């Protein structure tokens, strides 16, 4: 389709150019033909002037004055017909030829008069050379007609580009649908746990066995199963065990005779769930650890053997609540 349109535009442009050229040639020939038609009239006028010029020469004796008078008329007639492109050779040669046989004895200035007429008509000869110049404006409209021809050719691909532009958004939705994250499964609640505390001597020292034994007994611990001490529901050792106390050094057992016994520390632990209220049992366990540490001159540590902090105590309580909820 685009090629057909381009061929049509080229043909139309060529026809327009040929039409302008033909019109230019026709107008130039028309002007030239009109100029040739006017020439016989001009020649008749020039002959009449020559005849009158000859008659005046025969009647008048003052040749010099007549020549001056006629010289003034001849250039006037030449200036009137300059625009009509007169040929100087044909118009002024007859008077020159007629003047030579009739007045051969006259003064030589006669030869100077015709040369003055010869260069003057040369001026109109140059004027028709400039007349073909109007053909130039005829060629100017040809250029704007040829220029618009490529414009539709360039404008035509634009819709093609626009047609491809909507294709881009079609390929744009490349991002794959993001899979929804799987719901995070709740962490299974603990159904049992062990709460651990340590009572240790200061760095570089050990706990004395005799002082340790007295403090353990004052806290309500009784020597029992697995050769360790237990804290029962009743101070006399009756009822279920709430929490227990073992040696920090392996195998973790004690000898009832602790006079010569030393150790870097002891470990108190409670298993959850346990008998009764686990939170109340935890408070009792913490009080027992603080009492022993005060008696032997030690410190209370957590399960990582670091200084016990309020944050760690709250963490122990949260674990106990979690276990209670799991077993509720």
From Swiss-Prot:
Task: Please give the start and end residues of each transmembrane region.
Answer: 7-27
| Topology feature Cytoplasmic, residues | 28-328
Keyword NAD included in the entry's annotation:
no
Q: How does it sit in the membrane?
A: Single-pass type I membrane protein
Q: Which UniProt keywords apply?
A: Cell cycle, Cell division, Cell inner membrane, Cell membrane, Membrane, Transmembrane, Transmembrane helix
Bias category Acidic residues: which stretches?
A: 51-63
Q: List the disulfide bonds.
A: none
**Predominant subcellular localization, coarse grouping:** membrane
Q: Which SUPFAM superfamilies match?
A: Cell-division protein ZipA, C-terminal domain (SSF64383)
**What GO CC terms are in its UniProt record?**
cell division site; plasma membrane
Q: Which domain of life is it from?
A: Bacteria
Report the CDD domains cross-referenced here.
ZipA
| Biased composition regions of type Low complexity, renumbered to the chain | 99-115, 123-171
Quick check: keyword Ligase in the entry?
no
Spell out the subcellular localization from the entry.
Cell inner membrane
- Complex and partners: Interacts with FtsZ via their C-terminal domains.
Family membership, please give it: Belongs to the ZipA family.
UniProt name for this protein: Cell division protein ZipA
Q: From what organism does this protein derive?
A: Escherichia coli O139:H28 (strain E24377A / ETEC)
What is this protein's gene name?
Answer: zipA
């Amino acid at each position: 389709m685009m090629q057909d349109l381009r061929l049509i535009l080229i043909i139309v442009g060529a026809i327009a150019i040929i039409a302008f050229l033909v019109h230019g040639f026709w107008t130039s020939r028309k002007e030239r033909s009109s100029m040739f038609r006017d020439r016989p009239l001009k020649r008749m006028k020039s002959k009449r002037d020559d005849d009158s010029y000859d008659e005046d020469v025969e009647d008048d004796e003052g040749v010099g004055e007549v020549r001056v008078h006629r010289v003034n008329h001849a250039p006037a007639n030449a200036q009137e017909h300059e625009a009509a492109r007169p040929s100087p050779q044909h118009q002024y040669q007859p008077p020159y030829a007629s003047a030579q046989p009739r007045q051969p004895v006259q003064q030589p200035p006669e030869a100077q008069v015709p040369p003055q007429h010869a260069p003057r008509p040369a001026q109109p000869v140059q004027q028709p050379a400039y007349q073909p110049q109007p053909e130039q404006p005829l060629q100017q409209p040809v250029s704007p007609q040829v220029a618009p021809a490529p414009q539709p050719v360039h404008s035509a691909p634009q819709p093609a580009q626009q047609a491809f532009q909507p294709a881009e958004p079609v390929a744009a939705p490349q991002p794959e649908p993001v899979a929804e994250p799987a719901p995070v499964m709740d962490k299974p609640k603990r159904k049992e746990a062990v709460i651990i505390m340590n009572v240790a001597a200061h760095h570089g020292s050990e706990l004395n066995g005799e002082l340790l034994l007295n403090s353990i007994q004052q806290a309500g611990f009784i020597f029992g199963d697995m050769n360790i001490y237990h804290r029962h529901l009743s101070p006399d050792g009756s009822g279920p065990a709430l929490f227990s106390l073992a040696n920090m050094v392996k195998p973790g057992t004690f000898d009832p005779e602790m006079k010569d016994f030393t150790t870097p520390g002891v470990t108190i632990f409670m298993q959850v769930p346990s008998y009764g209220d686990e939170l109340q049992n935890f408070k009792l366990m913490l009080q027992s650890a603080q009492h022993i540490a005060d008696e032997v001159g030690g410190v209370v540590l957590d399960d990582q053997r670091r200084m016990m902090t309020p944050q760690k105590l709250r963490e122990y309580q949260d674990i106990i609540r979690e276990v209670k909820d799991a077993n509720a």
